[in-house]
From Swiss-Prot:
CC per GO annotation: chloroplast; chloroplast stroma
Pathway: Plant hormone biosynthesis; gibberellin biosynthesis; Secondary metabolite biosynthesis; terpenoid biosynthesis
GO process annotations (BP): gibberellic acid mediated signaling pathway; gibberellin biosynthetic process
Gene: GA2
EC identifiers of the protein: 4.2.3.19
Phenotype when the gene is knocked out: Gibberellin-deficient dwarf plants.
Motif (DDXXD motif): 531-535
Tissue occurrence: Expressed ubiquitously in roots, stems, leaves, flowers and siliques.
Keywords: Chloroplast, Lyase, Magnesium, Metal-binding, Plastid, Transit peptide
Residues binding Mg(2+) 2, per UniProt: D531, D535
Protein name: Ent-kaur-16-ene synthase, chloroplastic
UniProt enzyme class: lyase
Length: 785
């Protein structure tokens, strides 16, 4: 027999002792002016996105001639902005652009700015200063270890050719320049000989670098309703300069009306930016302070989703991110917009696919994991995983650049969503900083201008350590509870409090979920004790005596114990059931103690049945075994009482519903299969019943045990997917979403616990326990800047 741990998700009235502590601590935090100011800053970020100015795009807009005079700029305010916003070192680009991944981007922005000023015969001093910057950094142009902006090999040499047309010499060395132009022209010639939708989109996207696409029909298919091409000011400016399209002009005028003198690298961008902030807050565990703002954003996103808005549907990363977030928050969304990417070929036909945009693939991978039971998204998950693995290996070989994206990919592959626990994820994200890195490089670099990453990180650190201090106090109370109830005297029983509590604290981490965590942990400890009692510690008489006492449930009479062990176990069971029932009453407004008693009685009877099979040396059918084993797996006393303590009302008809019991059966069956697969060798050697050995015996299967185990892993995976689907379903659901998610959280616990070793034995797991419960997070000052 085996035991497991459970998790849930939620809100609640809290036990009196902790409530006083919480009131004090929360008031202390509320009085912390800096803490409240940080939260207010984040609320403003969510209300309005401010994207950084792009010197590169502003330069191309500045180069647009007036329709009334080719010798004058249409947008002189952009030219003036370039004159006024050169950096001290002679460059143009993002502030604080010293990061290695931005070096070529800065060169590109600087050259574009020089061209804009040269075109209009203005700013000789700035031009010379910019040329000096390019000369000093000329070695970076050919350095293959530095990240290239999208289209750099086409656009940068294209700008050099344009500089020649303007009688401007770029100080890069004739051999370097000639080689770059030769490679560019060869690339364009090769591209023209092979057709693909992705290539066509790419050539349209880098239009300012080609300057020789004469067929508007090849370009117009990428024009959006707002008049832009790809929502890119630079591409749209180049298109208007070449083709004089009214839609392009309308877009450019609207940009300058909104931003006055300098434009961003992409517009509109609000949807992706705001969704990415939500993901950042969730990945750091601080989203619960911004529920109102998050709901408002997602409501708006859902409206855009339903009407197929271009800002969402035409941007692959935004579409995947919106799908994942809307689904996770209970919105009814179809995966149809992602269907084209079920196969890698669908991705290859896009601009993102042609330029091998790893960031977009990562978003597709995460989206596919959020809806794993659909065959199309299973395929998507498969190819995106392989793609990311290959990309990761190539990064290692070439020691490439974007450390934040690399870390995100590593984490996504190492910690799949079905086996990751929130608080462990939060800690990891806080420490590596990837969750708050908001600089991206496409054709040029951009960042969310009004996001202060140090503020967000400090808030996350404060919250993590605050919650952890509560968790440590709860662990101390549980340690005392074990001693007070003499559980340490039961030498046959494994002492697994740390694991039992961790599984709840890592998922039900919010301070207000204290009662649910305590119930969860006590359920885990007691099911472990009872499991060991039925397995090795008790005689048949003792087992039957314990069942009789629970079945009788006489709180007024004097219990008759057959042994001291039975007395210890029944006493703590009785007190814990009554305590949980009393707490549940404050949440539910009704007596649920009888249901908790039944949960325990069902477990004890299932364990007795297994004990009888073992003592009789009888072999049940696989069907009979599994029908009993999902109960004996012992999740019932862990997760089911906790659902009463999460917050939402659970009427008796809901608890008796098929949906509620199916949630329990699916997660328990999955856990039992995972346990039996991992414990097959040990349990076979001990002569214990096991799903794998029973399958081999009854099915008279000629396949190897390895093949059978793989088959059973597939069955466990299908149960996990069925559970996930049931949790996500909103139409006709009778179980509140918060309660359903408790079962999903337990599924994640089980998949994590059984990834390597048999249940409680992993050293890695103990490391996780310590990091979540005992080790405060601290950051070096440089991590906060």
């Amino acid at each position: 027999m085996s035991i497991n741990l459970r998790s849930s998700g939620c809100s609640s009235p809290i036990s009196a002792t902790l409530e006083r502590r919480l009131d004090s601590e929360v008031q202390t935090r509320a009085n912390n002016v800096s803490f409240e100011q940080t939260k207010e800053k984040i609320r403003k970020m969510l209300e309005k996105v401010e994207l950084s100015v792009s010197a590169y795009d502003t330069s191309w807009v500045a180069m647009v001639p007036s329709p009334s005079s080719q010798n004058a700029p249409l947008f002189p305010q952009c030219v003036k902005w370039l004159l006024d916003n050169q950096h001290e070192d002679g460059s143009w680009g993002l502030d604080n652009h010293d990061h290695q991944s931005l070096k070529k981007d800065v060169l590109s922005s600087t050259l574009a700015s020089i061209l804009a000023l040269k075109k209009w015969g203005i700013g000789e001093r700035q031009i010379n200063k910019g040329l000096q910057f390019i000369e000093l950094n000329s070695a970076l142009v050919t350095d293959e270890t530095i990240q290239k902006p999208t289209g750099f090999d086409i656009i940068f040499p294209g700008m050099i050719k344009y500089a020649r047309d303007l009688n401007l010499t770029i100080p890069l060395g004739s051999e370097v320049v000639d080689d770059m132009i030769r490679k560019r022209d060869l690339d364009l010639k090769c591209d023209s000989e092979k057709f693909s939708k992705g290539r066509e989109a790419y050539l349209a996207y880098v239009l300012e670098g080609t300057r020789n696409l004469k067929d508007w029909d090849l370009i117009v298919k990428y024009q959006r309703k707002n008049g832009s091409l790809f929502d890119s000011p630079a591409t749209t400016a180049a298109a208007f300069t070449q083709f004089g399209n009214d839609g392009c002009l309308r877009y450019l005028c609207s940009l300058l009306q909104k931003f006055e003198a300098a434009v961003p690298s992409v517009y509109p961008f609000d949807q992706y930016a705001r969704l990415s902030i939500i993901v950042t807050l969730e990945s750091l565990g601080i989203d619960r302070d911004f529920k109102t703002e998050i709901k408002s954003i997602l409501d708006e996103t859902y409206r855009y989703w339903l009407r197929g808005d271009e800002e969402i549907c035409l941007d692959l990363a935004t579409c995947a991110l919106a799908f994942r977030l809307l689904l996770a928050h209970g919105y009814d969304v179809s995966y149809d917009p992602l269907k084209p990417f079920a196969e890698e070929s669908g991705f290859s036909d896009t601009l993102e696919g042609y330029v091998k945009n790893t960031f977009s693939v990562l978003e597709l991978f995460k989206a596919a994991q959020s809806y794993p039971h659909e065959s199309a998204l299973k395929k998507q998950c498969c190819w995106t995983k392989q793609y990311l693995e290959m990309e990761l290996s190539s990064w290692v070989k070439t020691s490439v650049r974007d450390k934040y994206l690399k870390k995100e990919v590593e984490d996504a592959l190492a910690f799949p969503s079905y086996a990751s626990l929130e608080r462990s994820d939060h800690r990891r994200k806080i420490l590596n900083g990837s969750a708050v890195e908001n600089t991206r490089v496409t054709k040029t670099s951009y960042r969310l201008h009004n996001i202060c990453t140090s503020d967000i990180l400090k808030l996350a650190v404060d919250d993590f350590n605050f919650c952890q201090s509560i968790h440590r106090e709860e662990m101390e109370r549980l340690d005392r509870w074990i001693v007070e109830n003499r559980l340490q005297e039961l030498k046959f029983a494994r002492q697994k409090l740390a694991y039992c509590y961790f599984s709840g604290a890592a998922t039900l981490f919010s301070p207000e979920l204290s009662d649910a965590r305590i119930s969860w942990a006590k359920g885990g400890v007691l099911t472990t004790v009872v499991d060991d009692f039925f397995d090795v510690g008790g005689s048949k008489e003792e087992l039957e005596n314990l069942i009789h006492l629970v079945e009788k449930w006489d709180l007024n009479g004097v219990p008759e114990y057959s042994s001291e062990h039975v007395e210890i176990i029944f006493s703590v069971l009785r007190d814990t059931i009554l305590e949980t029932g009393d707490k549940a009453f404050t949440y539910q407004g009704r007596n649920v103690t009888h249901h908790i008693v039944k949960i325990w009685l069902d477990l004890l009877k299932s364990m007795l049945r297994e004990a009888e099979w073992s003592s009789d040396k009888s072999t049940p059918s696989l069907e009979d075994y599994m029908e009993n084993a999902y109960i004996s797996f012992a999740l019932g006393p862990i997760v089911l009482p906790a659902t009463y303590l999460i917050g939402p009302p659970l009427p008796e008809k809901t608890v008796d519903s098929h949906q509620y019991n199916q949630l329990y059966k699916l997660v328990s069956t999955m856990g039992r299969l995972l346990n039996d697969i991992q414990g097959f060798k040990r349990e076979s050697a001990e002569g214990k019943l096991n799903a794998v050995s029973l399958h081999m015996k009854h099915e008279r299967d000629n396949r190897s045990k390895e093949v059978i185990i793989e088959s059973m892993k597939g069955l466990a995976e299908r149960k996990r997917e069925e559970l996930h689907k049931l949790v996500l379903e909103e139409k006709g659901s009778v179980v509140p979403r918060e309660c359903k998610e408790a079962f999903l959280k337990m599924s994640k616990v089980l998949n994590l616990f059984y990834r390597k070793d048999d249940g409680f034995t992993s050293n890695d797991l103990m490391s996780l326990v310590k990091s979540v419960i005992y080790e405060p997070v601290s950051l070096q000052e440089e991590s906060l800047t």
